[in-house]
């Protein structure tokens, strides 16, 4: 109002002048705003890679395009809270990446001139500058810091965990809670997995001046001890690194290794108080006979008196105990009310209890039981007072451990003088008193107590009571009561439940009296208010159990230091370090600098996939090329040359690197004239992943490399010959997408020298999509060409050109080619004595379908069948005669296409007579050379699936490798002579490479015969073969398998139409196997070398893919209602109780006795077991456990369920079969002799009922132990329920309180259960330590060899141990 009045008092001309100038200034500002609004803006997306918590977050800036780079850095620094100049910005993974060089932060160049693009996302990475973490801006106000600290005081979520709270928010970007070492001055510790409890304790010890200084004074003697196993030395190193390292966090693996822990220990959760005690014990052992021998006692040990006083005569028995920490109860037993404070819990700790009633105390003076007072009195408090808040309890209602999250306050300063009882010191001690109230203690008089203290003369323990005079001691205590003031400096916090959680530490620095949160690798400043949040509890009402909504983050251990200016130490300054610590500091700094240099090299190293087709081996090799970004392309070729080990294969100048797309098998471009270009520029910078690969291309010395230009497409051209019905291996032609089909034909014509006028071009776009290119003016792009393409061309003068494409011979040939797969077939080895000597009939060449005639033809004069050897030899001779006949036909017919195109099997009639005749002359000649049925090399191969799987001599080979190893492709260059492309890079066979690629991402289809109750019969009900099909293309060649497949092993490489049925496929293999298809089995071999039988004869081979392996095994094919059964022998008293015998066939409706009769000759012939039918039994097999005993009259599928690949136990009997009825129960008993520490052999006990009384009676009869002394326990785990003799006496549940065996906890309802029994009057053998260790070695070795040791009980908590020799005793676990 005053301004308005004063303006009205101005002269009129001056008023208008002021108004005009104001309007002009406003117009100028509006113009600037309007111009800024019209100026293009640049969107910058910055990712902070300096911190693990922020690496997944983004900060966005939208700035004008005219912004200088210098201003951009200032804006980024302001946004993220870093000091400008302490970080770098480099290009991220966007399309504009050309270099990883940091952007110049002092440049006045605009961001537009620097390469930033308006209207697009510009990705930037914020990185360390010169290997150092960015510096954090100092907060002017405590508000932001406090709020950040509120977030940070709690346990940080695991990196990568789902659902964790994100402290790093893009909108309100603040780093105050994640302070780097440069701000706090402290370094964090990396959590190995679950070592947060260790990190909390180590940081507390590091922040304790007295402990750190004493540790530094200790000097390690390398000549006396291994530094790796020295705990004090590794702690020294860790503390030095915590003081001097520039890293945000350092590893603790060297410390845990000195504990003797392996990597699995990092995954064990332990208690921080447990670790504290164990570590102090270990340090005391290591520091024996050194200056620090009594350090732990001096700093942490206190003393208290455990007493019992008779209330009638005043007589008192007592003993002196030492302690390292005081355990304080959170909530008294049976109470729902927790103690409110630590002081209240301390009072309860020393509160005496009255022993009365049945708990009366026997007084030595009164010579009778009297009421007494029992309690504890503190005699001495340590310099460093440790209080454990017992937050973990056991709930006897739910029988589970629980955590008590009740609120319990603790003061920053704790006065302990009120807990020293001076009256106790004044009480007369003239009377002798024995500690009959304390266990394992002798008499304890007052002079003995004095002697306890006098033994500590000269030891400075804070509050010393070393005077022998009671009066002096009382005076000392009285004078020091006022000096027992302790200062809190460490709070170890637990967040979580009794099942698990997270530890971190809140520690006050004695250097600046500031509180810090040490949460694994994160260190931050906190306040006193944050400490109060660890009291526990919640503001609302809370029931007995911990609630998910109540705070589960609360203090667990408190450490106080006595306030005594005379004794309170400060941390040693660097100039005060002992010489050995100075040397250690220098050594660690050098190591850190070396690591920094190595990280810098890694950060500037390009890592990319490298491929190379080996010029001689013709296999595609793969490796990772690591090259510094400043290395030139020429240098990178040399590195790749050595990496691929080509020194002896090809000269270096015959190699080059080209850009390659491995997925599409496409050469994108070559790098002519760029030999001196740095790899970083060539590859588009250093990236974690690249969207392309590199290929090390090779050539012969007389060839020249072709130039590959970007934008070209690669076309693999297969020439089709309709006369020979063959498809040639591909040649590679590079074309352009804007070329027409007519121009493309001309290009192919130059490459193949075939006329373009009659050329038919078929493009294979995808599986079963064969498109004839008929429109000459269409471009390749319009026809659907892509980076890598496959075409088939045919250019003959045949009339097939005028037939409709889908009816043409060309289409049929290509359709067959597209469905042809290559399989590797392992033929069986055969030997005399095989079970197939009987009932095997060789099919004659005239009619393979008539089995009756075949049977008659192979019979001798006496009607006996020929041996397998004769049959196979005849098969071989027949193949040879067929080959000779074909050769004669070729000679007679001359150029007749019929004879040259005939298949080896043309003259072998099949049920369908539709075998595709497509073998070339060369293939036929190869086939004629194979000798499948050499009788001198025949071996039997009757093994179980377990043997097959575990003892496999051949391995599955990757389909890509096999499919690329046939013949070299030819690369056509219209200007230069044709040369092989990358020495066979694109090599193919008759097999389509497209299918190999398509099948890579598809899992193999497994046969599901295991799920069926039976299998398809090879013949239908009328006896007609099921193998008839129109898809009968089948061509075979001999094949030499990899080394290790076995000498004499015969292999076939078969090209077959995958639409053929399994039945027809087996019939095609008959001449090579030498037996009818009904007498051999087909097993498919998977990548893990596991074999599964293919039994569905009506199904096609469509589930098979290129280069699958097939194993043929002799054995009769199953008929309807038949099942293949694996028979194992049960050997209860052998180290390996389960032994495979043979494969048998059981049929539906067959009785157990009938199956036993069929097994007898097979057992005699194949296994050498000459048994009578009543000398063995069959029983159920479940994994390795014996089960129900099958009785002779049981019928399969009626009384006994049976399935494919069923397994059964055969058990040889020692006497007459005792099992006669299903109401009986057969158990396996084993006696335990504790006095001898040994187990007897198994003995079977047959019970008439499930009565425990009957079991004990039978065991008593068997062993001679009186019935009343029999104790038994059920075995645990799988048969034979092995258990160490050191554990069996205590670990088993002996003599369960049940009357029948079929109830909890036994549940013995079936045969085969294992029962251990013993004489309860037999004493356990007492072992010396030497005997125990020796027995432990033997037992461990025995159990490991048998492989029967199992974990049958719920996982027990593993005791925390520190091994002073650096490692656990290996002899205890292995022989």
From Swiss-Prot:
Its main location: cytoplasm. It comes from the Eukaryota. Its EC number is 3.4.19.12. The keyword Cytoplasm applies. It is found in: Cytoplasm. Keywords: Cytoplasm, DNA damage, DNA repair, Hydrolase, Protease, Thiol protease, Ubl conjugation pathway. One of its GO terms (biological process) is DNA damage response. InterPro entries: Papain-like_cys_pep_sf, Peptidase_C19, Peptidase_C19_UCH, Ubiquitin-like_dom, USP47_C, USP_CS, USP_dom. It catalyses: Thiol-dependent hydrolysis of ester, thioester, amide, peptide and isopeptide bonds formed by the C-terminal Gly of ubiquitin (a 76-residue protein attached to proteins as an intracellular targeting signal). Belongs to the peptidase C19 family. USP47 subfamily. This is Ubiquitin carboxyl-terminal hydrolase 47. It comes from Gallus gallus. The lineage of its organism: Eukaryota, Metazoa, Chordata, Craniata, Vertebrata.
